[in-house]
């Protein structure tokens, strides 16, 4: 490690790392948690890289090595395996990105690393940080999802109104038809009443020409036909009450 620290002083890391110092993993850690590490090559030469960790059984790294062409960026996915998180236990896991300028002819990557001289190697270290979302974050995440049904309810509230309007239109149409029917009935009754009145007048004229004793029959006929105007008034009152009652309700 002393030689590695010496090389750090001699050769600064050529790659630009994002993030530069910390790899953050956000829980819960009951499933695989992935974070990305971007490696950018700002130089005009090809750069070989290798990603190492102090806890190889806890992480899966893809790709864990390769070559980056000049001006290009490679994204490395670091996958933390599920584990029982203890907030009192601080993570001691670390990663190291080791790099070397690629030789002109590369036939075997393993041979390149084995034959590399210490002063040719460059490396950067990153520490792992575990973050567990607190209760406030959970509430903030839940509030928008709760707000959606409320807004939807507000939007859905006025929807039944067109339905109620259509019902009133239907009811009005029925009332109009009922009105027409009742008007027809009233016209028939009026016509019958007129005929009965004419018949009454005719009988009255006949009575004058007949004996005085026959007036009782004429008066009897008049008493029979006299309730018809009252009947028309009652029917009209019932019709008006029915019509107004339907509209008020």
Swiss-Prot record:
Q: Pfam families recorded for this chain?
A: Motile_Sperm
Where is the site described as Involved in binding the phosphorylated serine of the phospho-FFAT motif found in this chain? 50
User: Which spans of this chain does the record mark as coiled coil?
Assistant: 169-205
Q: Which residues lie on this side of the membrane: Cytoplasmic?
A: 2-227
Q: Where does it reside?
A: Endoplasmic reticulum membrane; Cell junction, Tight junction; Cell membrane
Q: Name one GO biological process term.
A: protein localization to endoplasmic reticulum
In residue numbers, the region (phosphorylated FFAT motif binding) covers: 50-53
- Residues that the record marks as modified (Phosphothreonine) are 170
Is the Cell membrane keyword given for this protein? yes
Keyword Transmembrane, does the record have it?
A: yes
Q: Which UniProt keywords apply?
A: Acetylation, Cell junction, Cell membrane, Coiled coil, Disulfide bond, Endoplasmic reticulum, Membrane, Phosphoprotein, Tight junction, Transmembrane, Transmembrane helix
Residues with PTM Phosphoserine = 166, 214, 216, 219
GO cellular component term of the entry, any: plasma membrane
User: Membrane-spanning residues where?
Assistant: 228-248
Q: How does it sit in the membrane?
A: Single-pass type IV membrane protein
UniProt superkingdom: Eukaryota
Give residue numbers for the modification (N-acetylalanine).
Answer: 2
Q: Please list the GO terms describing molecular function.
A: protein-membrane adaptor activity
N6-acetyllysine: modified positions: 125
What is this protein for, i.e. what is its function?
Endoplasmic reticulum (ER)-anchored protein that mediates the formation of contact sites between the ER and endosomes via interaction with FFAT motif-containing proteins such as STARD3 or WDR44. STARD3-VAPA interaction enables cholesterol transfer from the ER to endosomes. Via interaction with WDR44 participates in neosynthesized protein export. In addition, recruited to the plasma membrane through OSBPL3 binding. The OSBPL3-VAPA complex stimulates RRAS signaling which in turn attenuates integrin beta-1 (ITGB1) activation at the cell surface. With OSBPL3, may regulate ER morphology.
- What does the entry note on its domains? The MSP domain binds the FFAT motif of many proteins.
Its quaternary organisation is: Homodimer; disulfide-linked. Heterodimer with VAPB. Interacts with VAMP1, VAMP2, STX1A, BET1, SEC22C and with the C-terminal domain of OCLN. Interacts (via MSP domain) with OSBPL1A (via FFAT motif). Interacts (via MSP domain) with ZFYVE27; may retain ZFYVE27 in the endoplasmic reticulum and regulate its function in cell projections formation. Interacts with OSBP. Interacts (via C-terminus) with RSAD2/viperin (via C-terminus). Interacts with IFITM3. Interacts with OSBPL3 (phosphorylated form). Interacts with KIF5A in a ZFYVE27-dependent manner.
Q: Which family does it belong to?
A: Belongs to the VAMP-associated protein (VAP) (TC 9.B.17) family.
Q: What is this protein called?
A: Vesicle-associated membrane protein-associated protein A
What is the species of this protein? Answer: Bos taurus
């Amino acid at each position: 490690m002393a030689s590695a620290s010496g090389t750090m002083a001699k050769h600064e890391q050529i790659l630009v790392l994002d993030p530069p110092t910390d790899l953050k993993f956000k829980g819960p850690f009951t499933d695989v948690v992935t974070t990305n590490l971007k490696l950018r090559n700002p130089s005009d030469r090809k750069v070989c890289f290798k990603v190492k960790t102090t806890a190889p059984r806890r992480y899966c790294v893809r790709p864990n090595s390769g070559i980056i062409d000049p001006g290009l960026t490679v994204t490395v996915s670091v996958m933390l395996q599920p584990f029982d998180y203890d907030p009192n236990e601080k993570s001691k896991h670390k990663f190291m990105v080791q790099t070397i300028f690629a030789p002109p002819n590369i036939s075997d990557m393993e041979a390149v690393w084995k034959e590399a001289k210490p002063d040719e190697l460059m490396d950067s270290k990153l520490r792992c940080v575990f973050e567990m979302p607190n209760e406030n974050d959970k509430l903030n995440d839940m509030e928008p999802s709760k707000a959606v049904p409320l807004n939807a309810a507000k939007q859905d509230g006025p929807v039944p109104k067109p339905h109620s309007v259509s019902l009133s239109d239907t009811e009005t149409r029925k009332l109009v038809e009922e009105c027409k029917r009742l008007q027809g009935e009233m016209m028939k009754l009026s016509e019958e009443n007129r005929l009965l009145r004419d018949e009454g007048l005719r009988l009255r004229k006949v009575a004058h020409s007949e004996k005085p004793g026959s007036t009782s029959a004429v008066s009897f006929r008049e008493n029979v036909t006299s309730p018809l105007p009252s009947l028309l008034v009652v029917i009209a009152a019932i019709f008006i009450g029915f019509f107004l009652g339907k509209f008020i309700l």
